[in-house]
Structures are given as C-alpha cells and as structure tokens.
Amino acid sequence: FPTEASRLAYSINAYNALVLFAVKRAWPIRAVHDVRGLLEPKAGFGFFWAQLFRLDGRWINLYDLEHDVLRGGFEDARIHAAIVCASGSCPTLSAEAYLPDTLDAQLDAAMRDFTSNPRHVRVDDATERIALSAIYDWFGEDFEAEARRRGAGESVLDAIAHFADERTRASPRRARAAGYTVVYRDYDWSVNLPHDDGA
C-alpha cells in the first residue's frame, strides 16, 4: 500500500464487505450468532472465528481482521465507528467506501455519528445514568488512548465528548460532573435493520 491511510481504508472496507458477504451467504438468519461452526465454544464463534475468507493471499476470519489487522495495526479508536458487524447495536454502515484521500474526515464523521446517536450514548437525567454502547466497554482502552492522543482528556467519556456533535457534546460532560453512573447497554446481536434513531 502506498500509504497507511490506503491500508486502513482497504482493511475497513474489506471487513465491512466480508460481513455483508457472510450475512448474505447465511441468509436467512435472525442474528449473526445463528451462523454456527462445526464447534461452537462461545456465542458468535461461527460468524467471527469459524468462517474463513481469502484476503491478500491468506485466509483470515473476521475476528483476526478486526483485532490483529485493524486494532493491532492502527492506533485509532474511530475504527470502532467504521466497522460494522451487521448487528443491531453496531454503528451505521457508511453508504460510501472509505477512501485514503478522505479517510480522516470519513472516520471523524463516523465517530461523530456514533457518539451522537442515542442508541450508543444516552444521558438519562431521570435516572442519573449515562447509558453507553457495550462497544465503549469492550474497547475502553482504545477510546481512552484516543482521548489522550487528541488532548481531550483520558476517559471514554472524554473521547465521546470530543467527537460528539455540538448538540450532544455537553451532555456527557455535564452528567459526569454531576456524578451520573455509567452503564453499558446489552449488545443486540440481531441482524441490523433500519433504526428509528430516536431510541
């Protein structure tokens, strides 16, 4: 690849395309966990580990593409807002491919959409809770490192506030200052369908 941006854009696009292919190949399914391997030692094994795809002359599964290639090869938490595992709690799939020349702006936009969507970040003043996507729990260290790289602070909530749109940005900071409890939502593994983003 001529640049790191080219390699990252290619890898994100490959992940999303392979997920779509895997769902289409297994259709009809209700959830990605419905795809089974010969053995199923844990939920999602068939979809994320057992299916192998030929990519760049080698066999790879979705788990390794996400964790070894994307997370291991690039220190950029915005990846979590760009890759989509075809599940209800995933970020929204971009209608456009990620391109090297516009990658930084595309990743910022994906992260802004993710952090500003009430399905992924919701401040509930009635219960004094901040409900976050499980993605922020699973990959908390990635988001904390992203906040530090951006000079935005050191926490997951700092990363969220940094990327959120103007309408949403103040809510997590205000809620944290008020001592609200952070809770992580259960992950919806059902195959994603169009959402009413007011949820």
Residue ranges and their predicted role:
Residues 1-199:
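Interaction/scaffold regions that mediate signaling and macromolecular assembly across diverse proteins
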